[in-house]
Amino acid sequence: MSEDTRNSRKVIQGRVVSDKMDKTIVVIVETYKNHPVYGKRVRYSKKFKAHDEKNEAKTGDIVKIMETRPLSATKRFRLIEVVQKAVII
């Protein structure tokens, strides 16, 4: 596989909502779209399971994930980096 193919994969930024599984995190990604008739911005969200090899991401962190080959029945992404750590109050 060439380096160009690896870099053309989707990179998504989202927030970790679950880190309860071993080496797996659940990331929620929110997007906004305008309603076709009324023009109001509507928020859509989707959850992705991502592979976290070192278990470094925690709940509430902002992370970047990249598309990869299927790692399990539901995992299609892997963790690239933790952009921002969660603030614990």
UniProtKB/Swiss-Prot annotation:
Keyword Heme among record annotations: no
GO molecular function, one term: rRNA binding
Source domain of life: Bacteria
Keywords: Ribonucleoprotein, Ribosomal protein, RNA-binding, rRNA-binding
Family annotation (InterPro entries): NA-bd_OB-fold, Ribosomal_uS17, Ribosomal_uS17_bact/chlr, Ribosomal_uS17_CS
GO biological process: translation
One of the record's GO cellular component terms: cytosolic small ribosomal subunit
Pfam families, sorted: Ribosomal_S17
Biological function: One of the primary rRNA binding proteins, it binds specifically to the 5'-end of 16S ribosomal RNA.
Alphabetical list of PANTHER family matching this protein: 40S RIBOSOMAL PROTEIN S11 FAMILY MEMBER, SMALL RIBOSOMAL SUBUNIT PROTEIN US17M
NCBIfam families: PRK05610.1 (NF004123), uS17_bact (TIGR03635)
Subunit structure: Part of the 30S ribosomal subunit.
Family to which this protein belongs: Belongs to the universal ribosomal protein uS17 family.
Protein name: Small ribosomal subunit protein uS17
Organism: Lactiplantibacillus plantarum (strain ATCC BAA-793 / NCIMB 8826 / WCFS1) (Lactobacillus plantarum)
Chain's gene name: rpsQ
